A protein has these predicted regions:
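Conserved acetyl-CoA-binding loop-helix of GNAT-fold acetyltransferases
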Residues: 106-108, 114-128, 147-155
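Conserved active-site alpha-helix within GNAT-family acetyltransferase domains
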Residues: 83-84, 145-161
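Short linear Ser/Thr-Pro motifs
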Residues: 15, 140, 148-149
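GNAT-family acyltransferases
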Residues: 1-111, 124, 128, 132, ...
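Conserved GNAT acetyl-CoA-binding A-motif
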Residues: 132-141
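Charged, low-complexity surface patches
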Residues: 55, 118, 142
């Protein structure tokens, strides 16, 4: 199985409390476990249980993004304990209707919510996208009633840009442009 790495080697970022490591095939089982929690899946899958086939497809897409684009989601690991916290990072949204299709996002196990980890990891992902990958704009999307994610978007500097309907569901979108 392709692990998404290139001859440049896997990418790892560190923050004060997290290790953000390039997505690997072994992360799939943890990803399925993450979305077994209905509260985690609530905004991503509109209240439906996430099927393991869909999560397998998503994980494979993350590996392809790392291989082809040298960016993608990171597995977020707690530095103190080594625990798998969730996914934080960049994701190319091929279905996005505009030219800027790279999104910053996060999905964390519920026990890690409310600690500022999405903010910390989101900022690191933005620095990586702008600094290492030279992106000019990074977007983020959420369900309109996902106030926690919208709050993180604002805390890391994204500004509200409007709404779109994607796959029959309304989403709000935010963006931040590279400065300098």
């Amino acid at each position: 199985m392709d692990d998404g790495t290139s001859r440049e080697g896997p990418v790892t970022l560190e923050t004060p409390r997290l290790i953000l490591r390039q997505w690997q095939p072994a992360d799939l089982d943890r990803y399925i476990e993450l979305f077994a929690d209905p509260e985690v899946a609530r905004y991503i899958f509109r209240g439906q249980r996430a099927r393991s086939e869909l999560l397998t497809e998503m994980s494979g897409n993350y590996l392809r993004q790392w291989r082809d684009l040298r960016l993608g989601p990171f597995a977020a690991i707690d530095r103190a304990t080594g625990a798998w916290v969730g996914q934080i990072g960049l994701n190319q949204l091929a279905y996005w209707p505009g030219p800027d299709q790279v999104e910053v996002g996060w999905e964390l196990h519920r026990r890690w919510w409310g600690r500022g980890l999405a903010t910390e990891g989101g900022l690191a992902a933005l620095r990586f996208g702008f600094g290492e990958r030279g992106l000019r704009r990074i977007i983020s999307t959420a369900a309109p009633d996902n106030h926690a994610s919208r709050h993180v978007m604002e805390k890391i500097g994204l500004t509200y840009r409007g709404t779109h309907v994607i796959s029959g569901a309304e989403v709000v979108w935010y963006a931040i442009d590279r400065t300098g």
